[in-house]
Curated annotation (Swiss-Prot):
Disulfide bonds: none
Name under which the protein is recorded: GrpE protein homolog, mitochondrial
Gene3D superfamilies referenced in this protein's UniProt entry, alphabetically: 3.90.20.20, Head domain of nucleotide exchange factor GrpE
Gene Ontology BP annotations: protein import into mitochondrial matrix; protein refolding
MF (Gene Ontology): adenyl-nucleotide exchange factor activity; protein homodimerization activity; protein-folding chaperone binding; unfolded protein binding
Protein location: Mitochondrion matrix
Quaternary structure and partners: Component of the PAM complex, at least composed of mtHsp70, MGE1, TIM44, PAM16, PAM17 and PAM18.
Length: 212
């Protein structure tokens, strides 16, 4: 029994001598290269579906992450809008309650004015008791006004000012030869503002233009 020969050498048989070994070696290298290429191609073919699947999963996850981010940003924006709306509503409710309370206080302040205006100068001169009482009421009225001013309730300076429909309510008009037409010459009821906003316009008499 002769020596074992590889399959590539078997057709040559006993003629595989040193003279034809280079040719045989070249053939072996070609077969080996072809076999490697075939194996690589088979591996790539087997890997392609898996790579494609992973790429698809990655794309899906990326889209899902983008959607979640968009939803989160929208939720944050909605929450901030809700906070702002709530803050404005609370402020409006607070301002409305404070405005109603302020108007009620103004009625008390008006009563001080009515009481002081009901006493004539002659009565003050005739009776020291009435004069003392009048001074006490005036002092109380002044303290009350200072307290209101400390909390943002301020009187409107109307007398002698040009008529402003945002600040004044004209109750009558009269010609006044020594005054400028369109200005306030009489304050029937003082007006007030709360933190710069008019809560009660001043009721005033306005100088009428005689040529109008």
């Amino acid at each position: 029994m002769g020596p074992y020969l590889p399959a590539i050498l078997r057709p040559i048989g006993r003629y595989a001598t040193l003279y034809n070994v280079p040719r045989v070696a070249g053939q072996l290298r070609c077969y080996a290269a072809d076999a490697k290429d075939a194996a690589d191609a088979q591996g790539e073919s087997a890997a392609d579906p898996r790579v494609a699947e992973l790429e698809k999963q990655l794309a899906d996850k990326s889209k899902e992450a983008a959607d979640l981010k968009d939803r989160l940003l929208r939720s944050v924006a909605d929450f901030r809008n809700l906070q702002e709306v709530t803050r404005r509503d609370v402020q409006k409710a607070r301002d409305f309650a404070l405005q109603r309370f302020s108007k009620d206080l103004l009625e008390s302040l008006d009563n001080f004015g009515h009481a002081l205006g009901a006493v004539s100068p002659e009565a003050l001169q005739r009776s020291p008791e009435i004069a003392d009482l009048h001074a006490g009421v005036r002092l109380t009225r002044d303290v009350f006004e200072k307290t209101l001013l400390k909390h943002g309730i301020a009187p409107i300076d109307a007398l002698g000012q040009p008529f402003d429909p945002n600040l004044h309510e004209a109750t009558f008009e009269l010609p006044q030869p020594d005054k400028t037409p369109g200005t306030v010459f009489h304050v029937q009821q003082p007006g007030y503002t709360l933190n710069g906003r008019v809560i009660r316009p001043a009721k005033v008499g306005v100088v009428k233009d005689p040529d109008a």
